[in-house]
A protein has these predicted regions:
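Terminal or standalone catalytic/regulatory effector modules within metabolic enzymes
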Residues: 1-166
Length: 166
């Protein structure tokens, strides 16, 4: 199995971030990073702009408003958005939709641990639908931070919408 240089560089960047977050990196962690990256790689011929999560922050609690700050890049343009929602993910997804000017609706959502331990890597999978066409798109993301994994998954689904010409 060969990994293209650009993909290997992305895997290494994600590995360094993971090493900063965890005390011990396991072979399962490395497998999750590698397999997930190859699963979400974009076709070389695609010309659709790719959105990428740069950073995020949430405020959430039982007696306070749920607020999400999201910073994205698209076509080398940096965008920032802040939104309120019923929960931190609702707020985050609203911020992404507003920044990108899309009407995507969350249809299905799941999170699972793909490695062991309290600091395990979580994988989020979302199914979103386009309000314009009704088409469904699936996205996935991984991180030790499940909010980050969820945002990666949502953005992955939106990137697929863009690739389909929406």
């Amino acid at each position: 199995y060969e990994i293209p240089d650009e993909e290997l560089e992305d895997i290494f960047t994600r590995f360094k971030k993971l090493a900063d977050e965890k005390k011990t990196i396991t072979s399962s962690d490395l497998e999750a990073l590698t397999l997930h990256r190859s699963k979400i790689s974009r076709p070389e011929e695609s010309t659709a702009p790719t959105c990428k999560l740069i950073s995020h922050s949430i405020t959430s609690g039982s007696d306070i408003p749920k607020i999400s700050y999201v910073k994205l890049s698209r076509d080398n343009n940096i965008m920032e958005g802040v939104e309120y929602g019923a929960g931190p993910l609702d707020a985050a997804f609203k911020a992404v939709n507003k920044m990108l000017g899309v009407e995507a609706r969350l249809e299905d959502f799941s999170v699972r641990a793909v490695t062991e331990g309290e600091d395990s890597i979580g994988e989020a999978v979302v199914k979103i639908s386009s309000a314009a066409s009704g088409e469904m798109y699936t996205g996935s993301g991984i991180s030790t931070d499940i909010v980050e994994a969820s945002l990666q998954a949502y953005i992955s689904g939106i990137n697929k919408m863009f690739e389909a010409g929406e």
